[in-house]
């Protein structure tokens, strides 16, 4: 062992054989012929495999809520039809959903909203990540191939603070093999995955529990209440029936004093508020990105007229789906979701009851 620092000459310690009958080793330095007995605890650190000296903890700095902003996370995985790309919403858009935990959209999937409670591990999982083991340092091409990193199954790329890029590449699974005592059958259990981090010239083993990107799907991060404008941020709402006949409702006032009118006549406030709550209850049950066809018939529509100057109207349309008891939701011209068809049916029933 050679010890080096900037304040003294290098010192090399030579460790000999273990002293018989004692938990000690013969040790001398290159500066002296004196031989010492040093306890096992004093030299055991030098007896380990070289990989045991590689740091495995907090390979990426922990998240700092004051200084860190995650701008984008991209998940590439072989079993996905397309990459998942989560982008931070502009602050003014995020504020619209400040009470409903929406800060990211899936720009890869027509800008559908992601639920912050469901996507948290995917967004922030690289911060503070630690490995359970080290497979190789300065790995060769052969070692990368052995670990499945020549053709990775999953790649995660995080962009934070506009310019800092962190990439995690994941390869083959690591197994432990046990035998069933009764049948003798071998049982393989996944205990980790080989992976490499940008800026780290090593192949690590990561626990499956620390890798949410291996199972993440757009559906399990979907924010289901996809459009929830506050009623008093609107000047009006227009409902369209299956014949595209328009029913225009005007909204005036605020939470303290308000009124709602249809064709110049005031509508019962409690009834209209209940109707509006139903409009917001459309619950996206799955993502649907296919283009509409002639078989998808228009069922109903909603236009939200925002009070804020310069803010464009939001338009939600419902179309029939030929394959199941759902209808297709188009938001501002983009096909995005499916919802149970009964929602659109009851929407028109509730409209008739209000009138």
List the model feature ranges, each with a label.
Residues 1-355:
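Soluble, acidic/polar mature domains that operate outside membranes
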């Amino acid at each position: 062992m050679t010890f080096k620092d900037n304040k003294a000459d290098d010192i090399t310690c030579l460790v000999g054989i273990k002293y018989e009958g004692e938990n000690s080793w013969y040790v001398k330095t290159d500066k002296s012929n004196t031989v010492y007995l040093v306890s096992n605890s004093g030299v055991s650190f030098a007896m380990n495999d070289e990989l045991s000296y590689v740091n495995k903890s907090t390979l990426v700095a922990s998240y700092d809520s004051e200084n860190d902003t995650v701008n984008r996370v991209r998940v590439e995985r072989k079993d996905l039809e397309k990459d998942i790309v989560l982008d931070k919403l502009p602050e003014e858009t995020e504020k619209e959903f400040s009470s409903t935990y929406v800060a990211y959209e899936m720009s890869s999937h027509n800008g559908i909203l992601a639920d912050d409670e469901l996507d948290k591990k995917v967004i922030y999982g690289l911060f503070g990540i630690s490995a359970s083991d080290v497979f190789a340092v300065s790995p060769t091409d052969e070692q990368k191939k052995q670990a499945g990193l020549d053709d990775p199954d999953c790649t995660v790329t995080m962009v934070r603070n506009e310019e800092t890029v962190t990439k995690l590449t994941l390869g083959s699974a690591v197994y432990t093999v046990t035998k069933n005592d009764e049948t003798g059958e071998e049982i393989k259990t996944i205990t980790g995955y080989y992976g490499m981090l940008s800026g780290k010239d090593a192949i690590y083993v990561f626990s499956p529990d620390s890798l949410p990107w291996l199972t993440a799907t757009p559906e399990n991060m979907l924010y289901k209440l996809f459009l929830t404008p506050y009623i008093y941020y609107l000047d009006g709402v227009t409902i369209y029936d299956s014949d595209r006949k328009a029913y225009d409702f005007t909204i005036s006032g605020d939470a303290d004093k308000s009124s709602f009118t249809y064709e110049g006549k005031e509508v019962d406030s409690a009834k209209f508020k209940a109707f509006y709550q139903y409009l917001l209850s459309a619950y996206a049950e799955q993502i649907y990105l296919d283009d509409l066809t002639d078989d998808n018939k228009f069922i109903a529509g909603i236009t939200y007229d925002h009070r804020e100057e310069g803010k464009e109207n939001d338009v939600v349309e419902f179309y029939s789906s030929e394959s199941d008891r759902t209808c297709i939701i188009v938001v501002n011209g983009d096909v995005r979701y499916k919802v149970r068809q009964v929602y659109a049916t009851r929407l028109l029933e509730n409209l008739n009851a209000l009138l």
